[in-house]
Amino acid sequence: MSPVPWREKRDEVFWRGTDRGAVNWAVRVQDMYKGSPRKHFLDAWGGTGLFDLAFLEDDLLNATVVNTDPSFVPLDRWPEWRYLLDLPGNGYSGSLKQKLTSSSAVVLLTDVGVPGAQPVYEHYHSGLQDLVHVLQISMDDAGEKVQWARANDGRLEQMVQNSNDYMRAFDQLTRCYIWKLLDEYAQLLQYTPTHSQTSAFIGEVSVRTLKVQRRPLRREAAAFRARCQQLLEEYAQ
């Protein structure tokens, strides 16, 4: 995403997207609407002057809609807005990672207003903190939170730096984790297959049995990060 100076950004919360997904024919249309946070949010806050929100044409078989849809805005232009909204949909938010690495503040809807419904995020989401990396909002207090953001411009600008630093560190940790995962997987695949002429195939595979995993302690996670950093530095030399 191309950088845009903070003072030159549009003072609105920006979002573009679709609301597609598999249709559950056993659920009434009214109930499907109630469980659609994106439609509900756009109905509630679109046109209030605080948000720049729009659904895009949803034709999965025709990529040329990007040239004909008047609401379409390419990804590299998103930083023209000071705040980027992340709305949960039918699955995880594929664009949240890009928003957190941009030069704009991320406004994150965490309460969709549906009892028992929880947004789905990727592995890096657990460390994100409200008012540190993102501005968390709900269906009810979205307008109030955005007005607060406008009145606390310095806090939001620092939030951008915090989210960028967080994603930079997490990206490094992710690379190290994948590296270690593939190394462990390669060790598990070190076996000698056998073939019997009396049958099509008989494989005798012996691998290590992994123990039941648990959530690592803080000191264990810190040690893993330190070791990852050391390995990456050694690999870069």
Regions found by a protein language model. Give the residues of each.
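Phosphate-/polyanion-interacting regions in eukaryotic proteins
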Residues: M1-P74
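Catalytic binding pocket for nucleotide-activated donors in carbohydrate/polymer assembly enzymes
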Residues: F72-Y235
